[in-house]
């Protein structure tokens, strides 16, 4: 499969903030990107080409359930966008209407 993985400004801001608290996050993300190159639709399908990916936090021993959530948007064609990221210890979930608004701001208005 030949496609690009791009990050949104919001995702980059989220990662920068989380890296201050979780020093192994960059290593975890490198591993995830390698996996995404083989399967861009990995994770839980939320509809409309939006996926929620569970990522284990290697900085703490909590497994995937207490790790990170990454929202990705697979633009049919050749681009996978990493839209936003949050820690389960900070936020339980993200609402559908909030997610649609974020995707519109971060991707559709480019």
Predicted features along the sequence, with ranges:
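Residues in soluble alpha-helical coiled-coils and helical-bundle/repeat scaffolds
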Residues: 20-23, 37, 41, 90
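Arg/Lys-rich, positively charged N-terminal/basic patches that mediate binding to nucleic acids
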Residues: 1-31
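Short, structured surface patches at the beginning of a domain
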Residues: 24, 28, 44-46, 56-60, ...
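Basic/aromatic recognition patch in beta-strand/loop cores that engages polyanionic ligands
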Residues: 41-85
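Enriched for short, Lys/Arg-rich terminal
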Residues: 68-110
């Amino acid at each position: 499969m030949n496609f690009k993985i791009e990050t949104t400004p919001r995702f980059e801001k989220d990662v920068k903030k989380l890296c201050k608290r979780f020093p192994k996050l960059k290593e975890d993300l490198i591993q995830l990107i390698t996996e995404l190159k083989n399967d861009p639709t990995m994770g839980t399908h939320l509809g409309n080409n939006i996926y929620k990916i569970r990522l284990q936090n290697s900085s703490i021993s909590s497994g995937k359930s207490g790790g990170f959530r990454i929202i990705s948007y697979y633009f049919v064609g050749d681009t996978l966008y990493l839209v936003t990221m949050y820690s389960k210890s900070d936020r339980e979930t993200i609402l559908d209407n909030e997610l649609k608004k974020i995707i519109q701001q971060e991707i559709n208005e480019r």
